[in-house]
Amino acid sequence: MTIIRKKHPLIKIINHSFIDLPAPSNISSWWNFGSLLGLCLIIQILTGLFLAMHYTSDTATAFSSVTHICRDVNYGWLIRYVHANGASMFFICLFLHVGRGIYYGSYNMIETWNMGIILLFAVMATAFMGYVLPWGQMSFWGATVITNLLSAIPYIGTTLVEWIWGGFSVDKATLTRFFAFHFIMPFIITALVLVHLLFLHETGSNNPSGLNSDADKIPFHPYYTIKDFLGALLLLMALMILVLFFPDILGDPDNYTPANPLNTPPHIKPGWYFLFVYAILRSIPNKLGGVLALILSILVLALMTFLHTSKQRGLTFRPITQTMYWILVSDLLILTWIGGQPVEYPFIIIGKVASIAYFTIIVILMPIAGMIENNILDLD
């Protein structure tokens, strides 16, 4: 068996990636989220495949086909809710994975980090298109509002929006193409994940100390396979509790009303995982400015590599930057809350302050804190 594992052209790639891979001996549970994201992706592809067997991407029948899945298909309700809540678990793991990367300075592995940002954009685009497919009220109006943002692009904006819509409004053509893209994107994401792993294995994993761990490596199997298995078990437990006891807690009640272009819901909002970027978008009165802020709220992560001023890699021994980091986390929670609130006082001003704070902490305060810590610790 060992000979096949190490000699077979296909199996040896798996062996070098998941079995004999040298891994740091001190990586904590925060390093579990990579494998959990892989598990989430597999769950989403499998449940999505079975949903696609019964779903019809036509404005006349899309809503009723989802109803049919829940009522008439064997365990259709389970597949549907695992897929819907699986997306939420996917984003929870994604945010924790990115948060871990920021805390421990993983952004210094430039290729892996930038690939991760591309993956984040790809997953967000996929989730947005998936949110449109049930063709409920929030699906329709969410699609209308978000695609309309592209009209802010000078000269080509309006033409671009109508090209994406396939007409003069969100209609049958839009739904059909969104379904096609939503189906193909997870496979593109899988390919990007492999590139992400390829770049990661070029440098090796980071670790909580932020130091080079070449002198103290252990094989990935059995140590981290067992650890990842425990993480997977906990994730599946959390997902099943969500699916079986609170299936609609993260959804929107408006999406149980069929899409009606003549009736606008009182508060149009996307899925909870987009609320922080939605709050940043709404906090700028200018349409183009809002769109740019929305894109920059994710792209700013790519700047972190160049804004790193500290002589230490992670935040483990950097109390000032640590404080900034946890203020940033709190700020993101505030933005998520504001994104779900109506556009009125005092939410407008809170959103503006939180949006300014978000960019200020990342671009200005954290680099300054790094320089101060260098001086305090005399690391110049």
Swiss-Prot record:
Kindly give the InterPro entries that the UniProt entry links to this protein: Cyt_b/b6_C, Cyt_b/b6_C_sf, Cyt_b/b6_N, Cytb/b6-like_sf, Cytochrome_b, Cytochrome_b_C_euk/bac, Cytochrome_b_N_euk/bac, Di-haem_cyt_TM
One of the record's GO molecular function terms = ubiquinol-cytochrome-c reductase activity
Which residues of the sequence carry a binding annotation for heme b b566?
Answer: 97, 196
The miscellaneous comment for this protein is: Heme 1 (or BL or b562) is low-potential and absorbs at about 562 nm, and heme 2 (or BH or b566) is high-potential and absorbs at about 566 nm.
Its membrane topology: Multi-pass membrane protein
Q: What is the protein's species of origin? A: Dicrostonyx torquatus
Q: Which GO terms describe its cellular component?
A: mitochondrial inner membrane; respiratory chain complex III
Q: Which cofactor does it need?
A: heme b
Binding of a ubiquinone occurs at 201
- The name on file for this protein is Cytochrome b
The membrane-spanning stretches of this chain are 33-53, 77-98, 113-133, 178-198, 226-246, 288-308, 320-340, 347-367
Which key words tag this protein in UniProt? Electron transport, Heme, Iron, Membrane, Metal-binding, Mitochondrion, Mitochondrion inner membrane, Respiratory chain, Transmembrane, Transmembrane helix, Transport, Ubiquinone
Q: Which gene encodes it?
A: MT-CYB
Q: Which family does it belong to?
A: Belongs to the cytochrome b family.
Q: Does the keyword Transport apply?
A: yes
Xref: PROSITE patterns: CYTB_CTER, CYTB_NTER
Instruction: Please tell me whether the keyword Lipid metabolism is annotated for this protein.
Output: no
PANTHER family to which the protein is assigned, alphabetical: CYTOCHROME B
Q: Out of the domains of life, which is the source?
A: Eukaryota
Which residues are noted in the entry as heme b b562-binding? 83, 182
